[in-house]
A protein has these predicted regions:
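Acidic (Asp/Glu-rich) sequence patches and key acidic residues
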Residues: 1-135, 139-142
Length: 142
């Protein structure tokens, strides 16, 4: 079973920590991607051994085509993911149920701050998509 999943964005303009709100915490090291269109790639969210989150995202994007485990996401997909993650934040016992059932190796005491950061990053991304041309993708290492 695979290990890693996440959300990457491609922007036309380079991001810097100074250009982001204080509550946003994304990976600022640019990813080197093999695409010919130029642009800058950044990782907005990353999950390791969180099969529960992977399953939620795959349910959201179930009808989409994929290219070797890469799925394009739109604003509605991001909104649905935020709603699902918020359920874990408001009810950590749901995360612990997933932990007990082998859907993740992390209990809620480890993941709660991570999920809150993900929510902030996704809220920023949803807003950023309103005013910027950005390509968003979910990668699935399975």
């Amino acid at each position: 079973m695979g290990l890693d999943n996440g959300i990457l964005i491609k922007t036309r303009q380079k991001l810097s920590p100074e250009s982001l709100p204080l509550f946003v915490n994304i990976e600022m090291d640019e990813y080197k991607m093999a695409d010919e269109g130029g642009g800058y790639w950044y990782e907005v969210c990353y999950w390791r051994k969180c099969w529960n989150i992977r399953n939620i995202i795959l349910d959201i994007i179930s009808s989409k085509e994929n290219d070797d485990g890469i799925y394009a996401l739109n604003k509605n997909d991001i909104r649905q993911l935020r709603y699902a993650l918020n359920g874990y934040i408001l009810n950590p016992y749901k995360w612990d149920d997933d932990y007990e059932n082998g859907q993740t190796i992390w209990d809620s005491s480890v993941m709660l701050s991570h999920l809150i950061r993900d929510m902030a990053n996704l809220a920023w991304l949803e807003n950023y998509m309103d005013n910027h041309k950005v390509y968003v993708e979910f990668y699935d290492s399975y």
